[in-house]
Amino acid sequence: SLFTPTLSRTVSASALRKEPKWTRFPVSEAREEIIHYQLSDFFTIKRGIATGDNKFFILSRDQIEALGLPWAVFRPILPSPRYIADDEVEADNNGVPMLDRQLFLLDCRLPEEKVKTTYPALWAYLEHAKKDVASRYLCRSRKVWYFQEERSPAPLMCTYLGRTDTKSGRPFRFILNHSRATAANVYLLLYPKPVLARAMAQDHTLIRRVWEVLNALCPDALLGEGRVYGG
């Protein structure tokens, strides 16, 4: 409680002025020196796609084929981190992740009139769920209710909710993505900024070395900088 805290710490005003993240306290002590570089210095970091209804917009290969939906409006999307055993995702010749659980995002950019004439099966699928799905907050706030956010495949992704991975014991995982899959909002997508991107283009081993360094980071350092979630 406020009057009988489990943990307390006295932090000087000067330390607080230098500290960008006060939620580190009281678990952590004041930093001896300020970190000069952050991940955002090297990467543009975006959360993954919030679909509005994963069950409707994210389908398996079997579901797509059973419904007779056109492959032209789907692109691969990574499953939940718990379905990815390794921290490196390989791809087949089509860029689809070589995972046991392969999922695809419905990502159609055509207006409804065009969908109706070009893809009748897709039109029927959209119409069947329009009443329930289109009225959801994220969907109804879009220009067209089934349009998805633009998230290109990222070479590096991070599981960021901060709950410890039971297999590795790590609160965060950095995944090296060789596929053309995007990801949902249980991931952060890391896109190299121009300077790093140019360096990676000249040295194709650099992305792997960066990934190895990120996964070697001390868990305490990551937890100290990450968001805090309840539950």
PLM regions: where:
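Polybasic, glycine- and aromatic-enriched phosphate-binding surface used to engage nucleic acids
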Residues: 30-231
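Flexible, glycine-/basic-rich loop-and-beta segments that form/coincide
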Residues: 1-46, 52-54
